[in-house]
């Protein structure tokens, strides 16, 4: 897409990136197995650093039940189990995204059309929110809030905008990425926190980022 940046930023052409991510537009039911597989494969290959920084930032209690929304083939879940083998982890994602990994409990569904499964102490969204516009994110957070028990926790982890001043990865690279995707947006930690509070969450905590170009981690609670 950036081979022709003028057309990209003028909005004159259909971008290749938007064609690569049809799931973002709620077209999960129209995706074939190859579409789903290539998406999950790319996410898995780039998930290791995100998983490491996320898991290293937060406190995780033993034996809790954890749901990873949009967890694909289980790259994040696999790293989580390595560090915390007592966790009971499930993945909620569109059909076919776990085709090459049967080691985790997989719950098939789309958060566009289905409710978030219940019975979990913690629900994570790893590189999910920035793929979507504010209304879609708000709807998702409302569903997650409803699915969590009192005292339950949500974990958000993804690249974010600079808070007090722009940064080259969030404000430039990922902002261009979401622009080319034709949906979604990178947000600052305070913008994500505002969305969480507006949808019922409290005790929002933004963790110091180890590598902002990889991810920033936020947790919030249902009380």
Feature locations, PLM:
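Alpha-helical subdomain
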Residues: 60, 69-223
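Conserved Class I S-adenosyl-L-methionine-dependent methyltransferase catalytic core
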Residues: 1-64
């Amino acid at each position: 897409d950036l081979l022709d940046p003028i057309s990209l930023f003028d909005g004159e052409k259909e971008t290749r990136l938007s064609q690569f991510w049809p799931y973002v537009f709620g077209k999960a039911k129209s995706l074939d197995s190859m579409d789903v597989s290539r998406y999950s494969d790319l996410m898995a290959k780039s998930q290791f650093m995100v998983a490491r920084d996320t898991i290293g930032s937060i406190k995780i209690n033993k034996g809790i039940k954890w749901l990873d929304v949009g967890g694909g083939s289980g790259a994040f879940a696999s790293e989580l189990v390595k560090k915390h083998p007592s966790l009971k982890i499930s993945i909620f994602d569109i059909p076919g995204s776990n085709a090459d990994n049967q080691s985790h409990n997989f719950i098939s569904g789309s958060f566009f059309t289905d409710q978030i499964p219940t019975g979990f102490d913690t629900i994570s969204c790893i590189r999910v929110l920035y793929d979507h516009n504010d209304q879609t994110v708000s709807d998702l957070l409302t569903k997650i809030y409803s699915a969590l028990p009192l005292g339950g926790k949500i974990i958000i982890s993804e690249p974010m905008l600079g808070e007090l001043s722009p940064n080259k990865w969030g404000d430039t690279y990922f902002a261009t990425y979401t622009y080319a995707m034709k949906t979604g947006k990178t947000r600052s930690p305070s913008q994500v926190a505002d969305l969480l509070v507006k949808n019922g969450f409290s005790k929002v905590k933004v963790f110091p980022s180890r590598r902002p170009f990889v991810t920033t981690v936020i947790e919030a609670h249902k009380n």
